[in-house]
């Protein structure tokens, strides 16, 4: 064998010892490098496992958050839909009440015999003139007082009519602003919620892609 031949050809035992020492040193150095490489690979595997675990946990957390946000948005949408339906129903109710109040006002004005009040006053006045020509001074005073009382009653009825008209007008004026929505979600608000939800989903996808790139980079480092 070449090794035995080399030993047999050595000048002295010292050279062989030196050779064996160098061989042992080289072997130990090689073993140390191998151990360092294996340690580095274990560290990389640990880091990769930690990264994968962190990524999995992050994905799970994001999914929980997205599910909670989606549930919250769905509840908000249901609440807004219910509010919108309620407002629509209130609007229809106010419209019906406004129309009813308007019809009642028109009917009241039509049925209120304002012209007959003037005619009645004229009849009383003509009757007074006729009575003045036929009655004594005391009777005339009595008729005058009666006419004055009738005139006062007509003025009271006139004021009552004016108050009723003012009340109906005030009621109509109060109903008109109430028809305008005071709460609930407009199209702009619903669109804003949709954009926010879309942004959260896009952000989650971006984070997922970033983690995937980190994973591919770690795999590439392990394969080299």
Swiss-Prot record:
The record's note on what follows loss of this gene reads: Elevated levels of embryonic lethality and increased frequency of male progeny. Chromosome segregation defects. Lack of syp-1 and syp-2 proteins in meiotic nuclei. Impaired homologous chromosome pairing. Lack of chiasmata. Increased levels of germ cell apoptosis.
Cell location: Chromosome
Query: What the protein does?
Result: Plays a role in early meiotic events; during prophase I contributes to synaptonemal complex (SC) assembly, synapsis and chiasmata formation and stabilization of homologous chromosomes pairing. Required for restricting SC assembly to bridge paired chromosome axes. Required for the timely progression of meiotic crossover recombination. Required for the synapsis checkpoint.
Give yes or no: UniProt keyword Transcription. no
Q: Point out the coiled-coil segments of this chain.
A: 63-97, 137-171
Q: Which GO terms describe its cellular component?
A: central element; chromosome; lateral element; synaptonemal complex
* Highest taxon in the source lineage: Eukaryota
**Primary location:** nucleus
Q: What is this protein called?
A: Synaptonemal complex protein 3
How this chain assembles, per its entry, is:
Interacts with gras-1. Interacts with brc-1 and brd-1.
Whether Coiled coil counts among this entry's keywords is yes
Organism of origin? Caenorhabditis elegans
Keyword list (alphabetical) reads: Chromosome, Coiled coil, Meiosis
A Gene Ontology biological process noted in the UniProt record is:
embryo development ending in birth or egg hatching
């Amino acid at each position: 064998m070449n090794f035995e031949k080399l030993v047999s050809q050595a000048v002295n035992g010292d050279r062989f010892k030196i050779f064996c020492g160098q061989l042992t040193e080289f072997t130990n150095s090689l073993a140390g490098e191998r151990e360092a490489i294996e340690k580095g690979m274990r560290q990389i595997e640990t880091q990769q496992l930690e990264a994968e675990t962190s990524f999995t946990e992050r994905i799970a957390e994001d999914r929980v958050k997205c599910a909670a946000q989606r549930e919250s948005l769905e509840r908000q949408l249901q609440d807004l839909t219910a509010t919108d339906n309620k407002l629509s129903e209130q609007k229809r109710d106010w419209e019906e009440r406004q129309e009813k109040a308007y019809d009642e006002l028109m009917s009241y004005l039509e049925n209120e015999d304002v012209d007959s009040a003037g005619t009645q006053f004229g009849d009383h006045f003509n009757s007074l003139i006729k009575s003045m020509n036929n009655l004594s001074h005391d009777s005339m005073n009595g008729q005058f007082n009666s006419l004055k009382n009738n005139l006062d009653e007509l003025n009271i009825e006139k004021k009552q009519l004016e108050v009723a008209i003012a009340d109906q007008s005030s009621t109509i004026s109060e109903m008109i602003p109430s028809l305008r929505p005071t709460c609930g979600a407009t199209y702009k608000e619903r669109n804003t919620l949709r954009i926010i939800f879309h942004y959260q989903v896009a952000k989650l996808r971006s984070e997922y892609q970033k983690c995937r790139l980190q994973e591919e980079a770690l795999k590439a480092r392990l394969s080299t």
